[in-house]
Amino acid sequence: MEPIIESFTKIDTSTISDALDKLGIDGQCFGIQSNSVSWKIAGRAFTVKYGPVSIEKGTVGDFIDDVKPGEIVVIDNQGRLDCTVWGDIMTGVAKHKGITGTVIDGVCRDTNRILELDYPVFSSSRYMRTGKDRVQVDSIGEAVSIANIRVRPGDIIIGDADGVVVIPQEIEEKVLAVAIEIEGAEHQIRLATEKGMSLKEARSYFNYHSLQTKGE
């Protein structure tokens, strides 16, 4: 695992979200949730975009053979809730290959199997109807949209019980530095309030609000 990915595994999405706000970056994927609150993922995006099926039907899930261990499959199904693009077979292959997890702007199915294999899937929802003959892969390895957030191949994806955030790779070091600073301030505030300092005083003393405010 890359050192920077390992560092991000230790920071929750709430703190990273605050760091993104501080830097004026939209990276929070609204509505994308974990199918188990116990999962935490961090890795680089392998992007896939689906579109409506054409007259000459294309592939649905063969791209999984090209995903590297440690990567996160990021699927743009344009937020469709009426058919799935991920189920038990894909889950089994991904788990066997050592893929870190899957993020879908759309739905998954075979949830019991996903939970049984303990393979992290983050999605808009769950629905049993197949995507076969309804959608097909339009592109692989190009920029996609997840809940209106742009994701490019290689961007860092973080997911946990509170949702999913996207970190553009060109500013990943800066986001990490700000997140660590915010995390440190929050730790100091907790310690100070446990010793009797008021929350207002602690937040002021450790410049907490400025750490979350863009441009300050």
Regions found by a protein language model. Name each.
Residues D160:
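Catalytic-pocket segment enriched in acidic/His residues
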Residues G163-V165:
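Channel- or pocket-lining gating/hinge segments that regulate access to a cavity or pore
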